[in-house]
């Protein structure tokens, strides 16, 4: 059976936004859970969440988002992003750099990408609020596209020019495990060289 190696890591999490921060948080038992203001309302039974302080993505307009300056996202791309796509984009940039993969390797038909996402309920909620307040004609035509589970995969594929196998997996809390396992199988079965 073909051996498979993890050669690049990237993180955007509530316990750190790079491998050094995540390792430090794990070693020092820091959890990353906070009480965000948006949950501090009587009707919300949930009062805590994992927050990512380096990113300010409250605006419904992605062009107003604030995130670490080392991540470059072309305007044409970010307009179709939901917050989870930006998090994935930034962590993927770290992983690509960590693995020392160049853009030509990514465009090789033997390079694929499998992602895990349930979509963006936040984006759906914001778009429905806008539609309810201003009418359907005021809605962004990309509203649904930027909210569905597949948006993560097709945004990353298009942005990086990936021509190999691509798929978005949605299976609740098992989604990431399924994406990793399926990507592992693609390499072991000789269908892809890198995922």
What kind of feature is each model-predicted range?
Residues 165-171:
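Short loop-beta-helix segment that forms the pyridoxal 5′-phosphate
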Residues 182:
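Internal active-site segments that recognize and position negatively charged phosphoryl groups
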Residues 1-119, 124-164, 185-188:
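Conserved "HGTGT" condensation-loop signature of ketosynthase/thiolase-family condensing enzymes
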Residues 176:
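Short conserved active-site loop signatures built around small residues
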Residues 191-195:
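Short, high-confidence coil segments that cap the C-terminus of an alpha-helix
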């Amino acid at each position: 059976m073909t051996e498979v190696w993890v050669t690049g890591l990237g993180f955007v999490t509530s316990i750190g936004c790079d491998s050094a921060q995540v390792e430090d948080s794990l070693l020092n038992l820091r959890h990353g859970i906070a009480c965000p203001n948006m949950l501090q309302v009587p009707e919300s039974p949930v009062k805590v969440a994992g927050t990512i302080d380096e990113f300010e993505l409250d605006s419904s307009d992605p062009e107003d988002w604030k995130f670490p300056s080392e991540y470059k996202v072309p305007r044409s791309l970010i307009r179709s992003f939901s917050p989870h796509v930006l998090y994935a984009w930034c962590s993927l940039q770290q992983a690509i750099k960590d693995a020392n993969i160049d853009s030509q390797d990514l465009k090789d038909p033997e390079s694929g990408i499998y992602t895990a996402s349930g979509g963006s309920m936040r984006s759906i909620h914001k778009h429905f609020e806008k539609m309810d307040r201003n009418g359907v004609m005021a809605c962004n035509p990309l509203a649904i596209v930027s909210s569905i589970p597949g948006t993560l995969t097709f945004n990353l594929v298009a942005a990086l020019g990936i021509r190999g196998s691509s798929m978005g997996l949605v299976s609740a809390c098992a989604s990431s495990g399924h994406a990793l396992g399926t990507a592992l199988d693609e390499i072991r079965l000789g269908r892809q060289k890198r995922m």
